[in-house]
């Protein structure tokens, strides 16, 4: 058995296969997933699992050099970053939700959560560990 927090085999495999600059998306239950990236559907019920929980597990294994969130997520939170963004190792950059959705096409994997908060999505860009 693995010793790290992330137990989901497909998600762990996707992270292990990342190269520098590759992207993984953690999305809410409503984020459209394009046909190209690996789809990892973790949604069980509304709210389960939450983006914050999946993000914590992913960050236990992934070196992140850049993160992206939709401007609409910040606007919806009254001008502040969503609470789960505090777990990110870097300050996220913002872009429109439409541009966010376009970038998901280039992601290596899109992880669907049960999160039902609008715009609760983040793109994680892989860094290097050396």
Swiss-Prot record:
The biological pathway it contributes to is: Carbohydrate metabolism; D-ribose degradation; D-ribose 5-phosphate from beta-D-ribopyranose: step 1/2
* Active-site residues, Swiss-Prot/TrEMBL: 20 (proton donor)
Q: Which positions are annotated as binding substrate?
A: 28, 97, 119-121
Instruction: Tell me the keywords, alphabetical order.
Output: Carbohydrate metabolism, Cytoplasm, Isomerase
- Write down any Gene Ontology CC term: cytosol
The kind of enzyme this is, by top-level EC class, is isomerase
Q: Which domain of life is it from?
A: Bacteria
Which GO molecular function terms does the record list? D-ribose pyranase activity; intramolecular lyase activity; monosaccharide binding
> For this UniProt entry, what is the primary localization, expressed as one broad class?
cytoplasm
- Which compartment or compartments is the protein found in? Cytoplasm
Listed under catalytic activity are: beta-D-ribopyranose = beta-D-ribofuranose
Q: What is its EC number?
A: 5.4.99.62
Report the record's Gene Ontology biological process terms: D-ribose catabolic process
What is the recorded function of this protein according to its Swiss-Prot or TrEMBL entry? Catalyzes the interconversion of beta-pyran and beta-furan forms of D-ribose.
The entry's family comment says:
Belongs to the RbsD / FucU family. RbsD subfamily.
Its quaternary organisation is:
Homodecamer.
Q: Show the NCBIfam families listed in the entry.
A: PRK11797.1
Q: What is this protein called?
A: D-ribose pyranase
Natural source organism: Paracidovorax citrulli (strain AAC00-1) (Acidovorax citrulli)
Q: Which gene encodes it?
A: rbsD
